[in-house]
């Protein structure tokens, strides 16, 4: 905590950035002189698809669906697309500078200002939004930031249309965000998870661009600083994000975004050694990179593809002096052809295009263009606080930890295997969010259950949720991790110990050993393995999975194959394709003490 306080006292010193000189405005020669022409044309073309397009209202009947049916995606699709429309038009106008997009932007701003609430029904307590209920959450803060950035970048042109519109923007952001944020002791201000920095990064933008009362501005900055300190203090020293790589983008990356806005850190800032935790938090994202465009997808990951948005990843690596991060971001940009397809990356940079982050990124575009690209493929990673090990080859990741993590799945001791950077044994991830996802019924969802991870079903019991259900690290050395996962199961499972060892061996093999002792025998023990590749039971002792083989002792184990494809929703089908399978290997013996070994080749 002392280090966090000292760090933020340094990072928040130069509050002269309130002068709002962070980004050149519309008409500044920077946008035509510094941004490559091909990138500018990409942004312009992206915006042109929205010229003369109607601004849809968001139907209250669709908003109410969440409370009535549990569906949250119907409203999200409509809301996110409307924000995308504005973000695309603003960037196009900024790049072209001919006022061609301004009428649509002004109409879009007015349409959003007329919305009752800027957030999602999943985060609202009644079935329809009320004008007087403006609690600050993720997406109304993010909408506010989009409007605030638009106001700043295009202030002269908006004022040219009508100074009253500038006043209306300030009034709405004050009413919806600035006043309730400063007056209310929201739970997320002290949280050690993504809501804290995600909201703070957007709150900070609203303060910088729309707060004109210096007393309130000073208090808001103080509160944002305090919230950042709370977030950093709660983070482990190893920088691991227990919410998974998917949420890193709105956890550690949003912390950096907040600090960047409040201080506008210069490239000559000397942040070491006080930023060791921030550096560790930053590096987590490439430490979880597998290769071939895949990333480790523990916790609530809506995909297993690499999740680095270069518009925040590159500035993060630049400011912290992390060459690996910078080169990773440039490599992603090269793979995605950012010079010609900049708008495609911009479009994918959030639930809708992240205007603020794109503006941050473009300040450093010339440095980016002269950077060497390099795909990060670390041989081994060990995060002792999060209890995650990765090793290669083949690529293996295994996690310990506990079952009370943010966006938790009951997955203590689970592993994934990606030979040559391709999925073989996988974590299914998470499907579409519904009203169940963050409710008491969360663990009714199959993707949250240990029986649908690469884990044992012991004595008839699955793992339990809660921080008390955890692993103990027994041994770690490069390429090998032994965990006692007995603590992740309820006492009724009658486990003395269950030692799981995952070892990467020469010849591109992974060996898994299960050494266990039970107090009593109640039901057959089973080993579960999840794979998108159809398993074939060709002969006793081997299971063929495409070009790979799972070898086991047929005197110990009886395998069966279950097609779990019917469980997949649209999100999971997009991740894994048309099929997903579960291998169940049932132990033949009822002995209380056993050792079982199987190998992936």
In which residue ranges do the predicted regions lie?
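Low-complexity, Ser/Thr/Pro/Gly-enriched N-terminal "stalk/linker" regions
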Residues: 21-67
């Amino acid at each position: 905590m002392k280090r966090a306080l000292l760090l933020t006292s340094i990072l928040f010193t130069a509050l002269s950035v309130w002068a709002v000189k962070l980004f050149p405005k519309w008409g500044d020669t920077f946008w035509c002189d510094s941004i490559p022409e091909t990138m500018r044309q990409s942004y312009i073309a992206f915006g042109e698809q929205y010229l003369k397009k109607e601004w849809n209202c968001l139907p209250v009947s669709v908003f109410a669906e969440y409370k009535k049916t549990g569906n949250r995606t119907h409203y999200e699709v409509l809301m996110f697309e409307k924000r995308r429309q504005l973000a695309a038009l603003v960037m196009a106008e900024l790049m072209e500078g001919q006022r061609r997009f301004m009428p649509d932007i002004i109409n879009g701003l007015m349409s959003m200002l007329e919305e009752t609430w800027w957030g999602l029904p999943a985060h609202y307590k009644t079935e329809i939004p009320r004008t007087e209920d403006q609690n600050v959450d993720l997406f109304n803060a993010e909408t506010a930031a989009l409007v605030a950035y638009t106001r700043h970048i295009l202030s002269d042109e908006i004022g040219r249309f009508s100074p009253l519109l500038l006043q209306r923007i300030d009034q709405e952001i004050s009413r919806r965000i600035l006043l309730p944020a400063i007056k209310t002791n929201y739970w997320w201000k002290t949280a050690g998870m993504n809501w804290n920095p995600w909201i703070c990064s957007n709150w900070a933008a609203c303060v910088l661009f729309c707060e004109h009362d210096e007393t309130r501005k000073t208090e808001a900055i103080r509160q944002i600083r305090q919230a950042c300190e709370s977030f950093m203090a709660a983070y482990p020293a190893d920088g691991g994000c227990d919410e998974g790589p998917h949420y890193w983008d709105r956890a550690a990356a949003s912390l950096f975004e907040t600090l960047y806005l409040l201080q506008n850190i210069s490239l000559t800032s000397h942040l070491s050694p006080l930023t060791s935790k921030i550096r560790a938090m930053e590096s987590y994202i490439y430490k979880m990179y597998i290769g071939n465009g895949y990333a480790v997808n523990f916790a609530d990951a809506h995909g297993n593809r690499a999740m680095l948005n270069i518009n925040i990843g590159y500035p993060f690596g630049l400011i912290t002096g992390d060459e690996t991060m910078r080169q990773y971001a440039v490599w992603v940009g090269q793979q995605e052809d950012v010079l010609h397809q900049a708008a495609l990356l911009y479009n994918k940079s959030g639930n809708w295009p992240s205007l603020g982050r794109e503006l941050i990124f473009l300040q450093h575009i010339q440095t980016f263009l002269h950077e060497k690209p390099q795909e990060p493929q670390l041989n081994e990673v060990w995060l002792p606080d999060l209890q995650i090990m990765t090793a290669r080859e083949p690529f293996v990741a295994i996690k310990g930890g506990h079952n009370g993590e943010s966006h938790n799945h009951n997955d203590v001791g689970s592993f994934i295997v990606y030979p040559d950077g391709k999925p073989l044994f996988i974590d299914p991830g998470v499907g579409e969010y519904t009203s169940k996802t963050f409710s008491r019924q969360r663990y009714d969802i199959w993707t949250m259950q240990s029986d649908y991870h690469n884990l044992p079903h012991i004595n008839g019991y699955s793992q339990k949720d809660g921080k008390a259900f955890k692993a103990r690290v027994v041994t770690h050395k490069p390429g090998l991790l032994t965990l006692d996962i007995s603590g992740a199961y309820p006492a009724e499972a009658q486990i003395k110990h269950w030692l799981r060892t995952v070892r990467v061996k020469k010849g591109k093999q992974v060996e898994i050993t299960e050494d266990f002792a039970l107090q009593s025998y109640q039901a057959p023990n089973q080993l579960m393995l999840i794979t998108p590749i159809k398993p074939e039971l060709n002969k006793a002792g081997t299971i063929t999975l495409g070009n790979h083989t799972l070898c086991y002792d047929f005197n110990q184990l009886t395998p069966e194959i279950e097609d779990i494809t019917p469980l997949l929703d649209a999100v999971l089908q997009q991740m894994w394709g048309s099929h997903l399978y579960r291998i169940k290997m049932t132990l033949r013996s009822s002995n209380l003490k056993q050792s079982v070994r199987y190998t992936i080749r």
